[in-house]
């Protein structure tokens, strides 16, 4: 398992902050510019890492759950270049809507596969998401979900973040540790 490349949170005074760990970036597949842009984008979208959006359960669309308002996690396997610098793809507001808007982009790159766009509350290859499911057993309310492929890249990233018990996500999934 690789170390987490970065995370963002808020301190006890509600001041948002983010970290990128250069040593971990060297070990994994993402370069530091992708990790930095990932955390910067998510700091802008949810500075204190405390927002949730109601949406369908990934496997039972009739059941509603609360998804973390993370702008990069679902597309964390995708990046693009700006003047030769790799940066993270990110979600747009339409991704957080339960209704599909014909012709709308739900992520900045606007694709999952050629000719196929990313559906609301879905995951691109290499991505992951976390959601709160009130029907889940106690201690398992926070539930991970990975892309429809093998999910290994997203799983490795999420496992690293969960192991980092100092992050808000780590504290949510390991209360009392």
Place the predicted regions along the sequence by residue.
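Acidic, glycine-rich loop-and-strand cores that form catalytic or ligand-binding grooves
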Residues: 39-49
């Amino acid at each position: 398992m690789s170390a987490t490349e970065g995370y963002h949170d808020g301190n006890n005074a509600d001041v948002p902050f983010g970290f990128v760990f250069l040593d971990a970036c060297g070990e994994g597949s993402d370069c530091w510019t992708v990790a930095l842009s990932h955390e910067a984008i998510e700091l802008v979208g949810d500075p204190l890492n405390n927002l949730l959006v109601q949406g369908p359960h990934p496997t039972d669309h009739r059941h509603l759950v609360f998804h973390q308002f993370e702008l990069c996690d679902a597309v964390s396997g995708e990046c693009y270049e700006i003047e030769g610098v790799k940066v993270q793809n990110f979600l747009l507001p339409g991704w957080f809507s339960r209704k599909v808007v014909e012709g709308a982009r739900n992520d900045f790159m606007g694709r999952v596969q050629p000719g196929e766009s990313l559906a609301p509350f879905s995951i691109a290859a290499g991505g992951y998401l976390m959601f709160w499911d009130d029907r889940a057993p106690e201690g398992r309310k926070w539930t991970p979900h990975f892309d429809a492929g093998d999910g290994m890249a997203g799983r490795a990233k999420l496992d690293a973040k969960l192991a980092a018990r100092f992050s808000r996500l780590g504290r949510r999934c390991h209360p009392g540790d």
